């Protein structure tokens, strides 16, 4: 894996409603500084209560929220803009794919944990947290930070409602999939998956069946739709092999 894939960055559990609140502030047209101040005020009674530590839990969580929807990496600004455009006419309960996609694109570590979890679901129907953490450590190195951050991501999965406690004590089961019917949203979500992948490239068949997208049931997408987005390059090597690559931002 390239260096970006080995970077963790995701060092707190981000609740879905916090992302919704962040997005509401973005849609209200607030400046970055005002959004940051508003998040500090809204989270003061939930995280680092009574503390003003510069790198406490509240500040680290706000950093994650800001990086996901406000101060995104330059290479992902067009992706963010397209995601916000897709929000028009959607309700809060329909934002899950957008939050998942941006989080995955900004933090590839999220995709790694999602891939491992999704594969376990396909193999055995459930996923034990210890098995997920062990596999992620095998991929990214035997570091305590890797296991700890994997736990943060799994807790976020639970908070977002994409995994549930199974009958087997301590294991997780997948929640019913979220239907993605709008082809524009489906293409955007697949672009997020491509941009989170090593070298921002993926085989088409692997992409549309990506275990890291296990929370979603995406309506059929064909390679031509990805190419038409203007953000993805589609190269057909043979009848059996089609490669999808993210175009570099201008």
Where are the regions that the model predicts?
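Long, low-complexity, charge-rich intrinsically disordered regions
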Residues: 6, 246-250
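Eukaryote-skewed repeat-based solenoidal scaffolds used as protein-protein interaction platforms
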Residues: 114-125, 129-177
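Short acidic, hydrophobic short linear motifs in intrinsically disordered regions
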Residues: 35, 39-40, 123-138, 198-211
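Accessory, usually C-terminal, subdomains that scaffold auxiliary metal cofactors
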Residues: 166-246
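Short helix-coil junctions and helix-kink-helix linkers
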Residues: 45-53, 134-145, 205-219
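Basic amphipathic alpha-helical segments that dock to polyanions
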Residues: 42, 59, 63-65, 150-161, ...
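Positively charged, polyanion-binding regions of nucleic-acid-associated proteins
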Residues: 19-26, 100-126, 182-202
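Eukaryotic partner-binding/assembly regions in large regulatory complexes
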Residues: 1-104, 115-116, 127
């Amino acid at each position: 894996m390239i260096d970006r894939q080995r970077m963790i960055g995701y060092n707190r559990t981000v609740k879905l409603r916090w992302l919704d609140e962040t997005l509401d502030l973005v849609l209200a047209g607030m400046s970055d500084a005002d959004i940051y101040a508003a998040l500090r005020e809204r989270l003061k009674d939930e995280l680092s209560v009574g503390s003003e530590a510069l790198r406490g839990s509240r500040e680290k969580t706000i950093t994650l929220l800001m990086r996901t929807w406000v101060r995104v990496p330059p290479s992902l600004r067009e992706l963010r803009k397209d995601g916000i455009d897709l929000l028009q006419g959607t309700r809060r309960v329909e934002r899950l794919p957008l939050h998942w996609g941006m989080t995955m694109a900004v933090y590839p570590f999220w995709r790694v944990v999602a891939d491992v979890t999704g594969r376990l679901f396909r193999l055995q129907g459930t996923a034990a947290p210890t098995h997920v953490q062990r596999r992620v450590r095998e991929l990214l190195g035997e570091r305590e930070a890797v296991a700890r951050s994997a736990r943060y991501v799994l807790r976020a999965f639970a908070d977002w409602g994409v995994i549930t406690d199974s009958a087997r004590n301590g294991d997780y089961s997948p929640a019913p999939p979220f239907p993605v019917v709008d082809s524009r949203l489906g293409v955007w979500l697949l672009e997020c998956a491509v941009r989170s992948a090593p070298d921002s490239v993926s085989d088409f068949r692997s992409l549309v069946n990506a275990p890291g997208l296990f929370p979603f049931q995406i309506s059929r997408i064909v390679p031509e739709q990805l190419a038409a987005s203007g953000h993805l390059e589609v190269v057909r090597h043979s009848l059996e092999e089609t490669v999808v690559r993210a175009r570099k931002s201008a």
